[in-house]
């Protein structure tokens, strides 16, 4: 091979390489496979190796196949490839190919398609002259086949336009309906009905004064300005009531005024009238008549029921037993734990468990409460409240002529002989 021929081969390879760079020549003209390296120079198309074998079977009178890299090319062959190409050849041989046609991928189907395309010229535009079509310049058919390059449009700059904001309707202020405050109902009846707290302040103070069970006498400072509704005690009785509340007055000075300051039951009830609230049937400090001490011992006071307050404070009937002796003292025999005998004796009188004698001076400093404090006469059965009991206790004198009351004196009308009977030998067998 001469130098001239070597230069031509290199030049032809360069021309084929440039033809393969075109967009239509990058794919097989028949099966659209990528990267064809074979060509049918008489038809002027680039094909893949599989389609090249089928083209060889068609015969050299229809297709002549050459390799782009392995075979030597001549100037005539290069000229045929330059005149046609895949795009121009498909425009000629696939002019009537249906748009919905799908190119086959299996070898028998591909061979049948290639034979119909080049041997039978089934999809060829027969109106065109092949030689005249070959000699046409590439620019002429490219202008009609290739899409017109889109003009580069300048980027549109969108200006920010402030949209007019919708004017919101001014919200009308909602008129809040005043909440009706219902008067608070006192279901338990604990509050006293007061018409007006400001205008009737004196009336409310009066009601509070009436509801106080122990405030039987108005204070000296407010007695002139405030008037309590209801029957109030007179000035003479008002001064004597605080003194009557003292349960332990002095024996020397108070013994002379006992007759003047003792109040009757009618005067006590008249102090309160209708304003005094009634106590329940079972009074706090009262015991029914049937709960009194047995009639065999009339000198002892009545026994309070176990459910009352005074009954709960009293000890069980174990008590103390007084035995007469030379020393004149009381020898305690038994006493329940948690109780103070002296306090009970001074506050409650004689318990039902204490047995005494008629000798004077055995229980110094103690006095028996009258039977009327603990029990009510069966014929009367009146209900007393706390204030009435206080008035009765205030009017009593716990001291006798010698400064103390003899323990053996009977409050229920019994004599000394009945008290001595309690120490009979039969009681302790």
Swiss-Prot record:
Zinc finger (C4-type): 28-51
Key word Flavoprotein present: no
Disulfide bridges in this chain: none
Residues modified to Phosphoserine: 127, 219, 223, 225, 231, 240
Main location: cytoplasm
Chain residue ranges for the region called Disordered: 138-184, 217-259
Ranges where the Arf-GAP domain occurs: 13-137
Highest taxon listed in the record's lineage: Eukaryota
Subcellular location, record wording: Cytoplasm
GO molecular function, one term: zinc ion binding
Name of the molecule in the record: Stromal membrane-associated protein 2
């Amino acid at each position: 091979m001469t130098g001239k021929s070597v230069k031509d081969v290199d030049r032809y390879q360069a021309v084929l390489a440039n033809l393969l760079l075109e967009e239509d020549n990058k794919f097989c003209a028949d099966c659209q496979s990528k990267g064809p390296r074979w060509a049918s120079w008489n038809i002027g198309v680039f094909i893949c190796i599989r389609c090249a074998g089928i083209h060889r079977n068609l015969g050299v009178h229809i297709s002549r196949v050459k390799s782009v890299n392995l075979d030597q090319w001549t100037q005539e062959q290069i000229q045929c490839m330059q005149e046609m190409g895949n795009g121009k050849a498909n425009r000629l041989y696939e002019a009537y190919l249906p748009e919905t046609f799908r190119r086959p991928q299996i070898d028998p189907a591909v061979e049948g398609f290639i034979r119909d395309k080049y041997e039978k010229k089934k999809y060829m535009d027969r109106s065109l002259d092949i030689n005249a079509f070959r000699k046409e310049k590439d620019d002429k058919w490219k202008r009609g086949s290739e899409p017109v390059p889109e003009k580069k449009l300048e980027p549109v700059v969108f200006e920010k336009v402030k949209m007019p904001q919708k004017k919101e309707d001014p919200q009308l202020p909602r008129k809040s309906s005043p909440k009706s405050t219902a008067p608070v109902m006192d279901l338990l009846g604990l509050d006293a009905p007061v018409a007006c707290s400001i205008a009737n302040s004196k009336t409310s103070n009066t009601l509070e004064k009436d509801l106080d069970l122990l405030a039987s006498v108005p204070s000296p400072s407010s007695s002139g300005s405030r008037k309590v509704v209801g029957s109030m005690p007179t000035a003479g009785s008002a001064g004597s009531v605080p003194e009557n509340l003292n349960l332990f007055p002095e024996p020397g000075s108070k013994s002379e005024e006992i007759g003047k300051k003792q109040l009757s039951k009618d005067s006590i009830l008249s102090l309160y009238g209708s304003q005094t609230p009634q106590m329940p049937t079972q009074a706090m400090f009262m015991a029914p008549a049937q709960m009194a001490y047995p009639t065999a011992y009339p000198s002892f006071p009545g026994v309070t029921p176990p459910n009352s307050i005074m009954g709960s404070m009293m000890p069980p009937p174990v008590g103390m037993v007084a035995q007469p002796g030379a020393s004149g003292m009381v020898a305690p025999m038994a006493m329940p734990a948690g109780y103070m005998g002296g306090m009970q004796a001074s506050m409650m009188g004689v318990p039902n468990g204490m047995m005494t004698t008629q000798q004077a001076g055995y229980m110094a400093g103690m006095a028996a409460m009258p039977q009327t404090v603990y029990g009510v006469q069966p014929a009367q059965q009146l209900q007393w409240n706390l204030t009435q009991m206080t008035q009765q206790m205030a009017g009593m004198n716990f001291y006798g002529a010698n400064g103390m009351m003899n323990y053996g004196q009977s409050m229920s009308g019994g004599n000394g002989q009945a008290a001595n009977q309690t120490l009979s030998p039969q009681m302790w067998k």
